[in-house]
Amino acid sequence: MKINRHILTLCLLGLTLSLSAYDAVGHRIVAEIAYQNLTDKARTQVDKVLGKHGIVYEASWADEVRSDNKYAYSYQWHYQDLDDNMTSADIKHLLDNPTAEGEHLFFALDTLTARLKKDKNDAEALKFIVHLVGDLHQPLHMGRKDDKGGNKVDFNWFGKKTNLHSVWDGALIENKKMSYSEFSQYLMDKYEPKKAEFKKHNILQSVEAAYAVRNMIYSYDTSDTSNYHYVYFFADKLDEMLYRGGIQLANVLNAIYK
C-alpha cells in the first residue's frame, strides 16, 4: 500500500507535536502571564525580537534544541541540584556564585541575562531566559542529584507508569484539562490580589519558594497512593509556582528592557 509522502509527513509531525507539547503547556502558561505583565516598552521590544506573542510560541524552544549537538552544552542549564536542608544563606551563596556547583541553571540565567542586557536583540538569549525562568519555578528542576530531580523516582499516574519529575513537568498541568491560555487567565484572576506582592519578589525569593515546594514533594507520604489526593494536596502549590514564574519572568525582562 502506498502512502502519500506529504500525508505521512503531516502524520509524523502531528505525532511529534503530541509528544512534545505535553510539557510545553507549563512553559506557555509562564510566558503568557509574563507577557501580560510586561511594560509597554518591554513588550514592544520582546515582540520585535521574537514576533508578536512570540514569547509564548518560543517558550519551549530551549527544550526542542537540546537534542541538537550545536546546543549540547545547554543540557545542564535546565536544572540546579540542591541538597536537602539548605538555608536561605546557602541558596543566596549559590546565586551569588553561580559557577560554584558547575554551569547549571543559576549560571545560565546569570550569563544569559548579562548577554541580553549587552545585546537587547539577542533572540537566542531571550528564548533561553523565557524557558529557564520557567524551569526555575518547577520545583524538581532543583531536586536531588542522586535521583536526577525525581527522574529516577517511579510514579504510578492513574494507571500509567511514569516518574516523579514527569508528574511535575506536565501530568499535574494536563490534569487541569485547560489550554495554556485558559490556565494562564485562571491564574491571573486567582492571584490578582497577590500580584503586587509577588512583583516585589526577586530571584532569591522565587528560588526559596520553589525549594520549599520541592521539599514538600520529597516529604510527601508515599503510602498514600491515591493520585486524587496528590492532585488536591499540591493544587495550590502548582498554581502558585506557575504564576510566580510568569511574574518573575516579567520582572527580569522589564529590568532588561527598561
Model-predicted segments: where are they?
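Transmembrane alpha-helix/helix-exit interface in multi-pass inner-membrane proteins
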Residues: L140-H141
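Small-residue packing motifs within transmembrane alpha-helices
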Residues: L10-L12
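Bacterial N-terminal signal peptides that target proteins for export
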Residues: M1-L8
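N-terminal, motif-rich segments that launch catalysis or mediate targeting to/interaction with membranes
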Residues: Y22-L132, R144-K258
